[in-house]
Curated annotation (Swiss-Prot):
This is NADH-quinone oxidoreductase subunit I. Keywords: 4Fe-4S, Cell inner membrane, Cell membrane, Iron, Iron-sulfur, Membrane, Metal-binding, NAD, Quinone, Repeat, Translocase, Ubiquinone. [4Fe-4S] cluster 1 binds at C63, C66, C69, C113. It is a peripheral membrane protein. Its cofactor is [4Fe-4S] cluster. It is found in: Cell inner membrane. The gene is nuoI. It comes from the Bacteria. Its main location: membrane. InterPro entries: 4Fe4S_Fe-S-bd, 4Fe4S_Fe_S_CS, NADH_quinone_OxRdtase_chainI. One of its GO terms (biological process) is aerobic respiration. GO terms for molecular function: 4 iron, 4 sulfur cluster binding; iron ion binding; NADH:ubiquinone reductase (non-electrogenic) activity; quinone binding. The lineage of its organism: Bacteria, Pseudomonadati, Pseudomonadota, Alphaproteobacteria, Hyphomicrobiales.
Length: 163
């Protein structure tokens, strides 16, 4: 570039005004930022949040105590104790605990479950004050399942073609 062209460019401040125009265009464009606690963005049906144990529509818990989720958990965060076999030959859990401090939210437990009993739900706001509150027992997991059942069923139905 010649010295004359360089001088004309710097005197006319072409780059400066180009930058101002670009800034003004972006200033008046619609914003992509959400004001988080007041506005929440959409979550994917495959989102892996807080764990929950589901029930059948008749109220019976789904978990059949097969312990596949306990076996596949890479963080060894799941502990299950199976009860004795019932008269109809089925088993249910006596104890189902998840240590959420250990959990890495990989979703293997959900994928391994043959009856869709353990799922990772849409809730991601479960911060606590103590570590003990992050130790989920069977009652807490069933309560989560009852609270989020509509969203859980919808997410599983949306994800069904890909399973």
């Amino acid at each position: 570039m010649s010295a004359l062209a360089q001088a004309a460019k710097s005197l006319l401040l072409k780059e400066f005004f180009g930058a101002v125009v670009l800034s003004m265009r972006q200033f008046f464009a619609p914003k992509a930022t959400l004001n988080y606690p007041h506005e929440k963005g959409p979550l994917s049906p495959r989102f892996r949040g807080e764990h929950a144990l589901r029930r059948y529509p008749n109220g019976e818990e789904r978990c059949i105590a097969c312990k596949l989720c306990e076996a596949i958990c890479p963080a060894q965060a799941i502990t299950i104790e199976a009860g004795p076999r019932r008269n109809d030959g089925t088993r249910r859990t006596v104890r189902y605990d998840i240590d959420m401090v250990k959990c890495i939210y990989c979703g293997f437990c959900q994928e391994a479950c043959p009856v869709d009993a353990i799922v990772e739900g849409p809730n991601f706001e479960f911060a606590t004050e103590t570590r003990e509150e992050l130790y989920y027992d069977k009652d807490k997991l069933l309560a989560n399942g009852d609270r989020w059942e509509r969203e859980l069923a919808r997410n599983i139905a949306l994800d069904a073609p890909y399973r």
